[in-house]
Regions:
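A gly/proline- and charged-residue-enriched helix-loop-helix capping module
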Residues: 96-132
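Ligand-binding loop in jelly-roll beta-barrel domains
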Residues: 204, 215-230
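Conserved short histidine dyad/triad with adjacent acidic residue
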Residues: 131-145, 164-168
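Transition-metal
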Residues: 1-108, 247-255, 277-292
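A short hydrophobic beta-strand segment most commonly corresponding to one strand
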Residues: 174, 224-240
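Conserved double-stranded beta-helix
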Residues: 200-202, 236-292
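A short beta-loop-beta micro-motif enriched in histidine and acidic residues
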Residues: 127, 140, 144-150, 196-197
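Double-stranded beta-helix
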Residues: 154-210, 215
Length: 292
């Protein structure tokens, strides 16, 4: 029995296409703005990024806290969120006790979805964790991609998310996707020509959206209210293999090779994943420093 998602989500297959769904977590005390104003400043600083100033597509989203540094404290930023053109992102809020139960329930629901399509295999749900987002009315999250699969849930305010095909090289070139997967080059090129590939989703409190692994997207918050949303991100055995294959491709390109793109043949991606993990194991055995 699902605790967080409406039962209709059980008929959908993750990472094949985006889909909207309804969630049952509205009113959860952890997501109340007053609770967030207490919890977030108490978290270790490395778990929280916040910035000021409207961002746009083409900005380096992963480094927005450096490029758009706020002069306000974190507490002041949260208190003035309605008027300050600010953005707060919290990594792994489940380390705080007020988020631990909702994290367990969301993880359990996602695992049920995976079992529905993949059967009762071990390690279906790989490295799940929460991300929390608070944004001023009208704020914009630049075009970016995730190294994970995502279930994004809206709790306050409304927004539009524009989502792009996972493997379309005219949106993100193979080389750029591989570098991003390897944490080597997180500023993605952007041009208006890419817009024609986008699929638009409007959603409000109580609604959610599945963002497939590595699918590019950007977000425009509406002007009606402060936006509060939370996602559970994770990998599956398939997406983990694809991630490792992307990282291997990036390494091979650095050696002057032209590897076949990821996402076209599952068997080839699995082989690349095996080779990448074997390489890491050898480097660890030889006590060589980790690299991308």
């Amino acid at each position: 029995m699902l605790k967080c998602f409406e039962p209709s989500v059980l008929g959908r297959e993750l990472d094949r296409e985006p889909f909207k769904f309804s969630h049952q977590l509205l009113g959860h005390p952890a997501l109340d703005l007053d609770n967030l104003a207490k919890v977030i400043p108490a978290l270790p600083s490395e778990y929280v990024k916040y910035s000021k100033g409207l961002m746009r597509n083409g900005d380096d989203f992963e480094n927005c806290d450096v490029q758009h540094r706020s002069q306000m404290s974190l507490a002041e930023t949260i208190e003035s969120m309605r008027t300050s053109d600010s953005y707060v992102m919290v990594r792994s809020p489940q380390i705080h006790e007020s988020f631990q139960s909702v994290f367990r329930d969301l993880s359990g629901d996602v695992e049920q979805l995976l079992r529905k399509t993949l059967g009762h295999r071990q390690r279906l749900l790989i490295n799940p964790r929460l991300y929390l987002f608070i944004a001023s009315p009208g704020s914009h999250t630049p075009f970016n991609i995730d190294r994970n699969s995502t279930m994004l849930l809206q709790f306050r305010g409304s927004k539009q998310l524009v989502l792009f095909p996972q493997w379309e090289p005219r949106v993100v070139a193979h080389e750029a996707r591989e570098a991003y997967a390897a944490f080597d080059g997180t500023k993605l090129p952007w041009s208006e020509a890419r817009e024609s590939f986008g699929q638009r989703f409007d959603f409000a409190p109580g609604e959610g959206l599945h963002i497939p692994f590595i699918a590019g997207h950007y977000v425009q918050n509406h002007e009606d209210d402060v936006s509060i949303s939370m996602s559970i991100i994770f990998n599956t055995p398939e997406s983990q293999a694809q991630l490792e294959a992307l990282q291997l491709n990036h390494k091979l390109r650095g050696m002057g090779m032209a590897p076949a793109p990821v996402g076209q043949r599952a068997g080839r991606d699995q082989l690349k994943s095996f080779l990448w993990r074997a390489r890491r194991k050898v480097r660890h055995t030889l006590r060589l420093p980790p690299d991308n």
